[in-house]
Amino acid sequence: LYQNIATSNSRFFSYAEMIDASWKNATMFFDESQILIAKYLSYRNEEITKEDLKAFIHKFCKDKSRDILGIIGDELSSYSCSLLKEMEINLFRKMSRMHELELKKHILPDKDLRDNVETAIKSALYMNYRRMYNDEHIIQNHPQLHNALFLFIRNYAYSGMFRYSKKGDFNVPYGGIAYNNKLMRKKLDYYQSIPLIEHFKKSHIYNCDFEDFLRKTQPTENDF
């Protein structure tokens, strides 16, 4: 990641900007999909069953497949894309969980209802990118994309956690409602700013034993 930023790698920044744009696209997709809210209200009011809701979401994702894939665009969807599957899973899981909580506690206010459905959409997008980040083909053959995905995950993973499974896959879930309106635009602008680039030109990062580091760099009292 450091090397891509320090060298102003255009391919890396192109991928990072595509990913950031997709987050805004997901917001627009939610705004244009208010039928999801209406259908959940039908489920809440017992006008439809849980199986009816599941069937509706399946059909919704199938009918809207072009729009759903349009969230990430042609290039990103050409890789190991699981967005359609994740959208269906996350929408149904979130709505089912919302209904369970409403039965146990209280009816969600309209804003909370909207925020939760938007979170399901954003979680689906996050899960798609997490799967791409773990994809061995991308790791081995598309380092700039992999680093852009790393940057995204660092910004949107729950509590900024970084955790891997025994298989070596990153497995932290999406951060949730508080992350829905978060964008990387300011960071990307900063990472491409002249002062930062000039600073990086004079910087070196080492990953080694501290004793080896001291031998290699031979710091003086003026370095501290």
What are these regions (language model features)?
Residues 1-23, 28:
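Conserved S-adenosyl-L-methionine
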Residues 15-16, 24-224:
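SAM-dependent nucleic-acid methyltransferase catalytic core
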